[in-house]
Amino acid sequence: MKSVYHHFAIIFFLKLFLCNCILSIPKKTLGKGLFSLGLNEFKNNVDNNSLNILGELKNSKPFINKSFIQINEKKDNVLLLKLYKQNIASDKLSTYYGKIAIGENSENIFNVLFDTGSTEFWVPFKTCKFTKNNIHNKYERTQSFKYKYDDKGLPSVLEINYLSGKLVGFDGYDTVYLGPGFAIPHTNIAFATSIDIPVLEKFKWDGIIGLGFENEDSQKRGIKPFLDHLKDEKILTEKNYKNIFGYYITNTGGYITLGGIDNRFKRSPDEKIIWSPVSTEMGFWTIDILGIRKEKQPYMNERRDDEVIVKYEGFHDGSNKSIVDTGTFLIYAPKKTIENYLNDLTINSCEDKQKLPYIIFQIKSKEIESIKGLSVIELVLSPNDYVIEYIDEVNSTKECIIGIQSDEDNINGWTLGQVFLKSYYTIFDKDNLQIGFVRNKQTINDETYLNESFLRVSKKRNKKKSYNGPL
């Protein structure tokens, strides 16, 4: 029997493995603390690069006092949600989470994982048997809570099965707050009454907000995914925002930009975003990776990590539906690609990093001139991008591993996790069903790239239209 950590892996998030969902029966004022972000706390929770990017916020006092910070309204018209990074030293893992509140006139404050690789939105209910130490926040019913009923008029009950446990609960509705004055009424939420997943005891986040699309399970239960709810109820557009969000992460934290694009997170404010069309049939944000190729490091006096002459040639392994996943750490490649083309992508010491090639992803695009009937863009990862540096806790030495691993389930698609997303400010456009990529502002170097240790194990993806996570 495989251990939990074989599935749990280097990946730090919970990916929902949605199986059979069964349908049968089963007051206080809002705390100001959630939406108060003092300048000192703000400084302590971002790295120096991010502080340079956000330096102009020093004089923006009216905006600092919000969990969602409204910035550059006339220019960018974007909301900013802070992501906190948690390092789990004992298991050599990391995770990013944000804060929300649930319920009118309540103190239901939660740390949540924002996950484009799942659809479910769940938090633990107050009676939930969750962890031994009872360290997680739990939901108490509010005046704005409503049950969701099935077609028999009974409360809708769910069971979600994971590889290492299960979650049981019921469906309901309540108001979700992302900041003062930014409420999302009547949001579909699953309230867990029993969670038998021991590894959750290690995480600071309490639940998951799935940012994926409708799938077979949500259709069966009559659940509207979170992003669909935002769009259908015009939560953003009525406030003159767009139905898009961006994902920007650094070595110490990050931000979700909601409703617009924050140009300060680009490497250059004027740098163009390149877009790839999204397909939704799998329930995830999937794009077509047409192939990849390797290039030797270019010789130049002032090298930029993605500055390489692109060529529309190289190794093409066919059009693969691939997931852009904010809940996965590594990049997972099709097994045949690792075996047939990237089999020499190995490293014995950190010094070997200089010998590694640039990896160029050839991705279907809407905009670039057509090549053999396909519109193609190329995104580049340097060895600095995909090699993970860490400190060996036993020997206190710097070690390196490759952040691109094989998907052992023989699934043809890729999973672009946070190793990839750390290099690109990534925009998820709900209205136009496209994902935008632009090199981010963060400069990664040998000393600051990653100082945490990570456990090198594997994650599995299941058959089409389902997704296996680390549990």
UniProtKB/Swiss-Prot annotation:
It is an enzyme of class 3 (hydrolase). One of its GO terms (molecular function) is aspartic-type endopeptidase activity. It is found in: Cytoplasm. It comes from the Eukaryota. The active site is at D115, D325. Keywords: Aspartyl protease, Cytoplasm, Hydrolase, Protease, Signal, Zymogen. One of its GO terms (biological process) is proteolysis. One of its GO terms (cellular component) is cytoplasm. Disruption phenotype: Normal blood stage development in the mouse host. In the mosquito, development of oocysts, and sporozoite gliding motility and invasion of salivary glands are normal. Its EC number is 3.4.23.-. The keyword Cytoplasm applies. Residues 1-24 form the signal peptide. SUPFAM superfamilies: Acid proteases. Residues 96-438 form the Peptidase A1 domain. PANTHER family: BETA-SITE APP-CLEAVING ENZYME, ISOFORM A-RELATED (PTHR47966:SF51). Belongs to the peptidase A1 family. This is Plasmepsin VII. It comes from Plasmodium berghei (strain Anka). The lineage of its organism: Eukaryota, Sar, Alveolata, Apicomplexa, Aconoidasida. The gene is PMVII.
